[in-house]
Amino acid sequence: MHRSRVYAVLIDAPRDEAARAVAFWSAALGVTARPLPAAPQYTRLHQALPGVNTAVQAVDDAPRMHLDIETDDIDAETARLVALGAEQVSQWQECRTLRVPGGHLVCVLPVESDAETFRAQANVWP
């Protein structure tokens, strides 16, 4: 048995367009944009989706959006999503990147939220 939940919605913007994307999304959603000093490629859109981290991520790739799913068992969650039709396309440290039906990306990562939030909001899978 393992647990998982959507941890973040990321708006991936090419690095040279990221500042403009941050300005747009911050104004469009009426929220404050806050860079993450420990991870400069991310700028959090504070409270854009209450309970879910939302950020613009500067990437060296095409623009897209993706979800981060946090889990207490990366192998089990990856296997569950693959059984549903996803395909693992890469791995970086503990994180796995999957392409899901429809072509979008999902990152499976270790639990990032506080224990109380994760316990209260995560789905339990057999």
Where are these regions (language model features)?
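Core segments of cupin and vicinal oxygen chelate
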Residues: M1-G51, A76-E77
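N-terminal beta-strand motif that seeds the catalytic metal site of vicinal oxygen chelate
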Residues: M1-V22, M65, I69, E112-P126
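Vicinal oxygen chelate
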Residues: R15, A62, L67-L105
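Alpha-helix boundary/capping residues
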Residues: W25-A28, L81-G85, A122-W125
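Conserved short beta-strand elements that form part of the metal-binding/catalytic scaffold
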Residues: L29-M65, L105-A115
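Sparse recognition of residues in long alpha-helices and their boundaries
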Residues: Q41, A83, F118-R119
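Short low-complexity, flexible loop/linker segments enriched in glycine and/or proline
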Residues: G103-C107, W125-P126
